[in-house]
Amino acid sequence: MHAQAPTSSTDLRLGIGAGILAGSFWGLVFLAPELVPGFTPLQLSAGRYLAYGLVAAALVAPSWRRLLRRLGWREWRTLAWLSLCGNIVYYLFVAQAVHSGGGVMTAIVIGLLPLTVTLVGSRDHGALPLRRLTPSLLLGAAGLACIGWQSLAAGKGNAGGSLPGLACAAGALVSWTVYAVANSRWLARLDGVTAHEWSLLTGVMTGAQALLLAVPAFLLADGAQHGAAEWLRFGGVVFAVAIFCSVLGNGLWNHASRTLPLALTGQLIVFETIFASLYAFAWEARRPTGLEIAALVLLVGGVVSCASAHRK
């Protein structure tokens, strides 16, 4: 486990701001299926990650030779499995969980990410003791409970899901927890490579891996035929998601991960849920319910509590 360097007040503010902005971009991912409803989740995933790889390759090209000299076989191997854990495997688990157990159950399980990352981060050398993080964890858990209750009520109690679906959701939770923790620890020990460059290299690796998804997604799919206008819209959506959610969002997240203690970074993941909810309210043209407002307030309160604990 790496030792977390002391975080100055300025670094704390900049890191938290980067984490919040990352969440605002990541929240847009949940609107993509609404914009191109005729395409499957596998096609959206393959398209997004292929676009991510192309954009990342173009942006990292000027620094490619220097990075090749800086990175050894160990770093490239790490990039490969981080790309699998944080992107490819994570999404495949989520897609199968939604298919087998329903979106409500999946969202509730994935919503535990802030808690799992924070708990793992609390074991790092130099991290705050868990008792000082207890208030933020309790606030986050209460917020997630509100979301779960609201989701179950909206689904009229039919959100139990099958055992395979629950297992896949748990797999997604483990996959992204491993990614968040390992990525943060690697960023802390990297020398001569910026957080943004590491994000772009992850994109290049993810794009290469997405080629394997493209075959079943586009060549073997038995789906509806799409016209030129639909494909053009699809291309626009996946490239927008790649640029804003993957390149900008992941770059900002890596900056936060490199600047902040892992326990605090874990709490910032809630902003993906918060912004996704706000975008959903705007898309559905409705006001949040009382439980939804309570959930958002509790989730933000958990982050504020965690940040305050790290200032003391």
Listing of model-derived features with the role each one plays in the protein:
Residues 2-3, 49, 149, 234, ...:
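C-terminal-most transmembrane helix of multi-pass membrane proteins
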Residues 2-46, 92, 136-142, 154-188:
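Glycine-/small-residue-enriched transmembrane alpha-helix faces in small-molecule transporters
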Residues 14-22, 66-93, 164-172, 225-248, ...:
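Loop-to-transmembrane-helix transition segments
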Residues 23, 47, 87, 104-112, ...:
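Helix-helix packing/entry segments at the starts of transmembrane helices
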Residues 25-30, 61-106, 110, 146, ...:
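Specific transmembrane alpha-helical segments of multi-pass solute transporters/efflux pumps
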Residues 38-89, 114-120, 174-182, 199-220, ...:
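Transmembrane alpha-helices of multi-pass small-molecule transport proteins
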Residues 56, 60, 129-154, 290-309:
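Hydrophobic transmembrane alpha-helices of multi-pass small-molecule transport proteins
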Residues 59-63, 113-138, 274-293:
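C-terminal transmembrane-helix exit sites in multi-pass transporters
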